[in-house]
């Protein structure tokens, strides 16, 4: 959500500030060891905003992802350093993205290679942009698996890109059930009902939610009026190893659920020591 930041702050606040937070508990524990992977995920997420060509840090880009109608944007590639095949999704930069961010109408998802339970519902504003590029991404990942059969899979994104990552994780897990998979969704809002969260939780692989202090976006749509549900393991940080904690459950008050914020806030543009759009592409690293 980097498009016209002030407009986003006002527009999303109108939707979400009126929502009350659920009951919270505090159980987070220090986990500095998680920081390096989340910092790398933040750099790759920033690179998706930058529009890197050829390479983004350790990832060699093999396919740019773009759909004109939905403005879905990102890239697929591989890392010889990490021995992984990566799907990286960009967050919001345009009016089209912003419209997707606030389109919370629930729909029944349909994606090739994915068998959804009948009661799963997700927001149209995330399903529509992902479904526009789903087949392209799965085809490219399949081709890379053929070239690098021993590589693992990963999905990464920030904000709307993080919300798309929550679908990417399910899509990759279902289409490639024999592959090891780790996904990192940064500063993302929840996108579906409890059945969706249960389905995401049931997938093979590891799904992490990385959140920044003073960011209200992870709390959007999570309170009783909308009642969307997160899944995965949350990590919370002010941008350093020492401040990184592993949260317990989805409503740990030591983490994003307890910061009292329910909209786009200044803390949203940073993640695990990286300010989005400022990290470059790693060409000189």
Swiss-Prot record:
Keywords on record: Hydrolase, Lipid degradation, Lipid metabolism, Secreted, Signal
Localization, UniProt: Secreted
Functional description taken from the UniProt entry: Secreted alkaline lipase that hydrolyzes acylglycerol lipids such as triacylglycerols and consequently releases free fatty acid. Is able to hydrolyze tributyrin (1,2,3-tributyryl-glycerin).
GO BP: antibiotic biosynthetic process; lipid catabolic process; monocarboxylic acid biosynthetic process
Signal sequence range: 1-20
pH dependence: Optimum pH is 10.0.
Keyword Signal: yes
Enzyme Commission number(s) of this protein: 3.1.1.3
Catalytic residues, chain numbering: 159, 215, 268
Keyword Lipid metabolism: yes
Family, per entry: Belongs to the AB hydrolase superfamily. FaeA family.
Major place of residence: secreted
Xref: InterPro entries: AB_hydrolase_fold, AB_hydrolase_lip/est, Fungal_lipase-type
Protein name: Secreted alkaline triacylglycerol lipase
Temperature dependence: Optimum temperature is 30 degrees Celsius.
Lineage of source species: Eukaryota, Fungi, Dikarya, Ascomycota, Pezizomycotina
Superkingdom of the organism of origin: Eukaryota
Gene Ontology CC terms: extracellular region
Native source organism of the sequence: Penicillium cyclopium
GO terms of molecular function: triacylglycerol lipase activity
Pfam families: Lipase_3 (PF01764)
PANTHER family in UniProt: FUNGAL LIPASE-LIKE DOMAIN-CONTAINING PROTEIN-RELATED, TRIACYLGLYCEROL LIPASE, PUTATIVE (AFU_ORTHOLOGUE AFUA_6G06510)-RELATED
Reaction(s) this enzyme catalyzes, per UniProt: a triacylglycerol + H2O = a diacylglycerol + a fatty acid + H(+)
